[in-house]
Amino acid sequence: MNQKRTNDYNFIDRDKLYDLINKKPASKNEISDILEKSLKLKGLSIEDASKLLQIEDEELYQKLLKTAGYVKNEIYGRRLVLFAPLYIGNYCSNNCLYCAFRKDNKSIDRALLSIDQIKMETESLLKEGHKRILMLQGETKGNSFNYFLEALRAAYSVKVGNSSVRRINVEVAPVEVEDFARLKKEKIGTYVCFQETYDSELYKIYHPEGPKADFEYRLNVMDRAMAGGIDDV
């Protein structure tokens, strides 16, 4: 289990959020004003977002989709980036109810790839044309952080003709600032960590056991990642 840091805290006001989504739906004029505001690309308030989530009118919903499409294209452009997942291990100490890798699932085979196997998998992906990878593994003491760093280096070292991996995005369990600083040195792309739910009460239900059961440690992971120098999360 991760040790609790003194500055880990639940900064989400659960009661406020539920109050917002249970309010009377906004009028058409109010929704139109919010959508117009979003076109300025300056962001929306929590209150604005909660009103958009309550839209049931089909005409307003279509307007929402059109506005969202415009905002997406203005920020990201008309492009689609593909990446291939590379699972290097499915041993896990967590018991998340929705996940096939949960420790109580006895119906799957478990594996932890050797460095040579990781190179072989990377070579196969390169031959298929993939140059962007998402590397991930289950969370357990057997899958050490040093092993993960070695796996990154191995994947980056593979060459097939003139092709090599351009970018490895990383989905690894939350760690401390010092380890994030080590991860930064490996020239990773984006650091990814899913919370699954930001409702602390639901979180307890879906994550009953294991390191991931620590809601606040996971909730504050991006603060630690950025403190470690990772600027793409």
What are these regions (language model features)?
Residues 1-83:
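Flexible, acidic/Gly-rich N-terminal and inter-domain linker regions that tether
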Residues 36, 45, 72, 83-84, ...:
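Short, functionally important structural connectors and interaction interfaces within domains
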Residues 103-119, 124-233:
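Core AdoMet radical
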